[in-house]
Amino acid sequence: MKTVILLVFLWGLSCALPVARYHNTESESSEERTGDLAGSPPPPTNSESSEESQASPEGQANSDHTDSSESGEELGYDRGQYRPAGGLSKSTGTGADKEDDEDDSGDDTFGDEDNDLGPEEGQWGGPSKLDSDEDSTDTTQSSEDSTSQENSAQDTPSDSKDHDSEDEADSRPEAGDSTQDSESEEQRVGGGSEGESSHGDGSEFDDEGMQSDDPESTRSDRGHARMSSAGIRSEESKGDHEPTSTQDSDDSQSVEFSSRKSFRRSHVSEEDYRGELTDSNSRETQSDSTEDTASKEESRSESQEDTAESQSQEDSPEGQDPSSESSEEAGEPSQESSSESQEGVTSESRGDNPDNTSQAGDQEDSESSEEDSLNTFSSSESQSTEEQADSESNESLSLSEESQESAQDGDSSSQEGLQSQSASTESRSQESQSEQDSRSEEDSDSQDSSRSKEESNSTGSASSSEEDIRPKNMEADSRKLIVDAYHNKPIGDQDDNDCQDGY
């Protein structure tokens, strides 16, 4: 890659130097310099940086000034293909396009490369250079101003274009343009060098106080001074960029480290929050399950109480009803107390406690309270079974008393036994269908039975025939319901298998 760049550079020089010979009258000095350049090619590092610095102002010279030479165009086109910072030819346009791309990207390499104008000026600057020490100091000051302005060119691209036009004015007389342009640019840059002109062989430059009559020695001194100043500037610019880059890298590392810490903390906090949510959800599910079991057991106890009440109302006489009701009322507050204890357990389990120790303590309390509630449930169930046994014994006593009364009444006793049996069968069949209907029908049956008892005690044999018709009709109705339920099955489901018939 470097060899290709050197070949392109030599080809551009070979095309540019004959044009410079025709425009300049100092043929001797220019021929000697071309011989030196053809004999020894410039070093690659300084020459490449100075090549790119020369390419951008000459590329703008093509758009701003119409009287630029072919050498400037060819150099601007050839140098626009190479960037030492990138290593590959990223832009194939002119120098102005490359400068705009680098200004947009915010790269500082272009400003550093523009500072190295010295080596090329010292080697083949042409006869129109400023040869006195005063002019050299003025040009160094102007070049320093241009470097400072070029460093600020990233923020203001319009200012960078103006200063690049001034740099182009410095490079145009060095490349060997027309004598009038070189005179105007030298007067603007040199700071009042009136006696300078590009005519003659260098003897007219003595008016400005040259130290020697030899133009070659003064030019070489100027070239060395500019090379040293350019090297110092490049080192300073590199020194300025290096600490800023290191500081930026340190700041970025610290920001990344802090962001990682905050990210880890957020992860830890999220995991803790998820753990708390899972604990709270598990406790809520446990409390809900306990509530569901409590509600189921309460519903069971209520259904058992209802059945006990219905049986006691159907079979027991009026004198023994208050005793069974009092026993059932005594069983209800125990169940209410158990439900209240369960509600307290659920409220305790649902309380959000952030500490793990308090959570563990609450869980243990909730487990112990659940065990207590289960014990209370078992005790309530045993009480309900005892109440059922008491009610059954009361029913048996009532049946025995009724049998004694029936023995005294004669036929009425047998009729009352049939009524009690029919009422019990009807209540059982109807309870299996629906609880609400069973309650209403049991109440009506109990009222009918009490009325029939009163009528049997008062009327005697006249009412016995009517009471015989009623239980027979009710038994027939219950049998019809059972038969209808059996015959209303679909035809395909007569067998107990789940499969359809025929397969």
UniProtKB/Swiss-Prot annotation:
This is Dentin matrix acidic phosphoprotein 1. Keywords: Biomineralization, Cytoplasm, Extracellular matrix, Glycoprotein, Nucleus, Phosphoprotein, Secreted, Signal. It is found in: Nucleus; Cytoplasm; Secreted, Extracellular space, Extracellular matrix. Interacts with importin alpha. Glycans are attached at residues 356, 394, 457. The keyword Protein transport does not apply. Residues 23-35, 158-175, 233-243, 267-286, 293-303, 467-492 have a biased composition (Basic and acidic residues). Residues 54-63, 407-418 have a biased composition (Polar residues). May have a dual function during osteoblast differentiation. In the nucleus of undifferentiated osteoblasts, unphosphorylated form acts as a transcriptional component for activation of osteoblast-specific genes like osteocalcin. During the osteoblast to osteocyte transition phase it is phosphorylated and exported into the extracellular matrix, where it regulates nucleation of hydroxyapatite. InterPro entries: DMP1 (IPR009889). Residues 98-119, 203-215, 362-373, 493-503 have a biased composition (Acidic residues). Transmembrane segments: none annotated. Disruption phenotype: Mice display rickets and osteomalacia with isolated renal phosphate wasting associated with elevated FGF23 levels and normocalciuria. GO terms for biological process: biomineral tissue development; extracellular matrix organization; ossification; positive regulation of cell-substrate adhesion; regulation of enamel mineralization. Residues 138-150, 332-348, 419-435 have a biased composition (Low complexity). Its main location: nucleus. GO terms for cellular component: cytoplasm; extracellular matrix; extracellular region; nucleus. Expressed in tooth particularly in odontoblast, ameloblast and cementoblast. Also expressed in bone particularly in osteoblast.
